[in-house]
Amino acid sequence: MDIVKNEICKLLTKRTVLILLFLLVLNPVLGLYTMNTVNDDGYTGKDYSALYGEISNYSREDVLPEIEQRQMTAEAYGRISLCSRVYKEALACLSYDEYLDSVNEKADEISIMNKFSGNGGFAEKNAAKTSRVYSKLNGTVPEVIDASGLLNITDNELTDYVAVIMLFIIALNLVFYEKSENQLALLRTTARGRRQLMASKSFVMIMAVILITLLLYGINAVISMCFYNPINLKSPLQSVYLYYGSPFKLSIGQFLACYFPVKIISFILLGLFFMLICAALDNIIFVFVASAVTVVIEAICYTTISGTSFLAFLKYINIMYGVRTGRLFSDYVNINLFGYPLNTGVLYGLFWLVCIAVCIFAVTNYLNSVHEKKLLLLPGFACGKNTGCHTSLFLHECYKALVPGKVLLILIAAALFVVWWNPAEKLSYDSVDEVYYKEYMDKYYGPLTAKTNELLDEERVKYDRLSDNIAYDMEQGKSESYINIKYKDELSRQEAFNKLTAHVDYLKTLNEGWLFFEKGYDILTDRTDFKNRDTAQAFVYVILLIAIACGICGADYANHEIRLLRTTRRGRKQHMGIKCILGFLGTVTAFALVYIVRLCNVLSAYGTHGLNAPAASMEHLWRISQNISVGQYILIIMLMRFIGGLLVSLFVFAMFKYLRSGMSVIISCVLFIVLPLALVAFGVTNAQYMLLNPLLIGNIF
């Protein structure tokens, strides 16, 4: 028990407490900001809750006509979209019996089809099992209620990932700090070695998880009670639209009683996993990169893999599936396990039980054994290892960064990742219309002139004749199928031409508009449609920059070599100058790997014909000056990202100078560089303008 008390005291240092309090305060502040900020659909979270409060007094028979009436009389776009959303949710609640009937009907259809085909496989078993599960919900009557308060607690992505960052910081303080200071070496000669100590650290992590969960989600619950309509804990869980397809016959109160134990268990697994990474890796750079890559890969698997994919097990055997706990209750999904439908909730339960046991055993026993670093030399190499000695400070710093600083390994891993992440881009079309649209753009490529307008008018006359011919055939009694087959190519071209003329109408508002096929440039410059790619690139860029900068500076502070330079004639001036040069070269390398490779890949597939055209010719860049070309705009974006990378490297250098600890520097980078980017990924309004985000993302105009 004394060891446990000591470990708790270690967590209560001024630095750790201040960081955790900062994150604890940041969570409700961002939650309140998001609640009062207009979203992309034109309304706020308070507007959504207020509309539910207004319709709560209407009976089940009158609520839909009332919402429909409000939608018809609404004038603002935001109000219309808000009413449309609430109408959809209310309709789903009031027609829940029809939803249950559709589940049974689908099961019957699959059963009949499999009887005729003679194949009683997974599909039939899955349909029958799903029907049996949902038959238990007969008699459930969902209510039209405001679910904002509940979702603020159970479906708050921002809170979930703030908790992940807090667990990472606690794992660093519990395990890596003592390990990096060689304090654990003192315990090798004791009777039980480090086993009892590591068991105590695991117990403290479990206690910290429980406390963090109660604080973070308890604060969210207080916000829900103060700013949203009251939650009726006796209402069926299916009253909440997110949990409309839930197979569990639970009230909202019972759901909350099940939700938090599952949430805590998932966080315990993640916290122990972070502790295992800290125990297994000796370098803070590797700890940071391994933890960041693990969370990113888990999040990518959870969000991008389809539930029907053969890789679906990676979606559901996933720590993030448990961290985003509400999804365990919102859907009923079975995966194919040798022809037997196994529920993903059961699968995840088995997964976390096994993983928690493995992590506790590994964390407790790994550091108990002796791990000595051995220098391996090839035969005959030792005699010649001193040949070619030099006194170049620059080459010495290069060696320290590449080998002790692990930058060489990081660059090799980054290069392999870039090769996998950026396969050869090919010219692709979303539809047949787009093929014809490109043909038109290539045909009329160039400035929009009077001659171009004449050619467009001639083409428009052709489609006017086409409309006359179709009208004539319809008068002759020709069927619609006959007309679609006869004029298939012409109709496809007409859709492309209509899209072209709409774009021409926009170009006429400019002093000098250009016609060119802009899809490749949309990929590089459109922050709306390709926002996720920009954010993902910024994450990779930042992780690589932090790892390289820590490798350049970290070796000197890890072995306290920096103290030896105080008594030299020039102090650290020349030394830091060389490190700045290496930081610049590292930034150039990271920038080339993340952005230049992608740029060359896209331009090689879609061509460079539009680089000289005004950037404003693309409709999403209507704010950009017409004097700036597409090529210049892309250059501006790239320059912003490069400057952002330099600032990240300078930030890491400055943190090393003032904090003198690799662990403290990593925590600072997570708080001030990684976390703001995470807010962009979470969809927090205007987060792209925080700190270094405008420079790192680039596409903010």
Residue spans for each PLM region:
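A short amphipathic helical element positioned immediately N-terminal to and/or at the very start
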Residues: 1-12, 187, 390-402
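Transmembrane helix boundary and interhelical loop/hinge segments in multi-pass membrane proteins
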Residues: 171-186, 190, 194, 549-564, ...
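Membrane-helix interface segments
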Residues: 16, 193-194, 283-288, 571-572, ...
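Alpha-helical transmembrane segments of multi-pass membrane transporters/translocases
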Residues: 17, 31, 266-274, 295, ...
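Membrane-interface helix starts
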Residues: 8-23, 284-286, 398-413, 662-663
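Central hydrophobic cores of alpha-helical transmembrane segments
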Residues: 22-24, 285-298, 411-417, 663-676
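Secretory targeting signals
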Residues: 17, 23-71, 107-110, 114, ...
